[in-house]
Amino acid sequence: MSKVKGDLEKSDKRPPSSMSTGSADSGVFSSGVHASSPSHSQGSSSQSGPPSPTTQLNSLLFETANLIAVNEQLRKEIAENKQIQTNQMRALRYSSNPVDQPFVANSISPHHGFPQRPPRGERRMQKPESYKTVICQAWLESKTCTFAENCRFAHGEEELRPAKLESRQNNKYKTKLCDKYTTTGLCPYGKRCLFIHPDNQPNAYIRADKLYEVSQRHALADLRDHVESQIMTGNTRNSYNQQPPPMGGLEMQSSPMKSSSDSSHMRSPMAQMNCETTRPHPSWPLESSSFFLPPEMSSINNNNLMSPFETPFPNGSTGIQPHFVTAKRRAAFPPVPSNFQQDDDNMSSIPGFDHLAEDMAKHLELW
C-alpha cells in the first residue's frame, strides 16, 4: 500500500502539460522564453505541421540569389560571343577589301579569330641572334650534314659569326668540365664554351685522342667530294671529245666479242696507235683475234696458242681437253705473259691514276 501511495504522489507532482488549458505556457499563448528559442519552434513546427512563413521566405530569397548569379554569368557569356562574332565579321569584311584593312586586322585571321602565321619566306629571313655562331655537330663529326647550306649552324670556322651575347661573368664560369668534350671528345662550342676543355692545345673542338679519327673522316669526305667533282667534269669532257666511229659506224670498243684483256690493251696509247695503223677489214668479225695484233705478235701467238680440242699427249689421242690442261699449256709460253705485263705497264701510264693517288695521300694526312 505504501508503494501505491508513493506512485500517486509522484504523479501529482508532474509539471502540467503544455496542451492543458489552465497552464501559463499552453497552446498559442506561449511564454517569451519558449518563443525566443528558434530550435524549439522549428522542431515543434516540423513535427506539428507545415513550415513557418519565415522559413519559406528564407528559401525563396536563397533561390532568387542563385537565379540572379546565373543570369549575370549568362550575360557575360553573351557579351563575349557578340565580341567574337563582331571580330569575325570585321575580318571577313576586310579580307574582301584589303585596301581599307587597318593595322589591327593584320593580327586577326578570317577563320576562328586566331592570329595569322607569317609567310614562309619572311619566317626564313628572320634569323636569330645565334645563327651561325656555333659549329654544326654533324659537320664536326663527319663533315656531312643533311641540311647542307640551309643549316643554321656553321660548317667551319670561316662561317662563324661573332656572338652578340657576352660570356656569363659569374662565379661558376669555367669551374666545371664540359660533358661533351670529356665524354664524346667533341664540343661544337670550342673556345666559346662556358665549361672547361682540358688539354685542348691542338684543337679546341676535338680532343687530342679523337683528332686522328675525326681527321680521317674529314679527309674521306673531302676525297669523296673531289672524286665526285672529277667524275662530273670527266663526263662532260668525254661528251665533247667523242670522235665519230670509223668504217660506217663500226667501233671496236663496242664489240661484244672482245675479252677483258683486249679491252685493257685497247685503252693503252700503244694499242691505239696499232689500231690506227691496222684498220679492220669490213669483214672483221669473221677474222681471228690475231688480225688486230702487230705482225710479230700475231705470228708468235699463231705458233704458240693451241685449240681447246688439241691434245698434249704424245700418243696422238684425240678428245676434249680439260680447261686446266689448256690453261697450263698456254701459261708455258713466255710471249703471252709478256703481253699481259705490257698491258699492266700501259695501264699505269694512263694519266689520272697518279693524280688520284697523290690526292688520296694528301687528304689522308693529318690536319
UniProtKB/Swiss-Prot annotation:
Biased composition, class Basic and acidic residues, residue ranges: 1-15
Keyword entries, A-Z: Coiled coil, Metal-binding, Repeat, Zinc, Zinc-finger
Tissues expressed in: Exclusively expressed in the hermaphrodite gonad. Weakly distributed throughout gonadal oocytes from the mitotic stage to the developing diakinesis stage, with expression restricted to the distal region of the gonad.
Sections of the chain in a coiled coil: 63-92
One CC-aspect GO term: cytosol
Knocked-out gene: effects: In adult hermaphrodites, double RNAi-mediated knockdown with oma-1 results in a 20% reduction in number of eggs laid. Triple RNAi-mediated knockdown with oma-1 and oma-2 results in a 85% reduction in number of eggs laid.
Positions with biased composition (Low complexity): 30-49, 252-268
Organism superkingdom: Eukaryota
Lineage: Eukaryota, Metazoa, Ecdysozoa, Nematoda, Chromadorea
Name of the protein: CCCH-type zinc finger protein moe-3
SUPFAM superfamilies: CCCH zinc finger (SSF90229)
Protein function: Zinc-finger protein that may play a role in oocyte maturation and fertility.
InterPro entries noted in UniProt: ZFP36-like (IPR045877), Znf_CCCH (IPR000571), Znf_CCCH_sf (IPR036855)
Zinc finger (C3H1-type): 130-158, 172-200
Region (Disordered): 1-57, 107-126, 235-268
Single GO molecular function: mRNA 3'-UTR binding
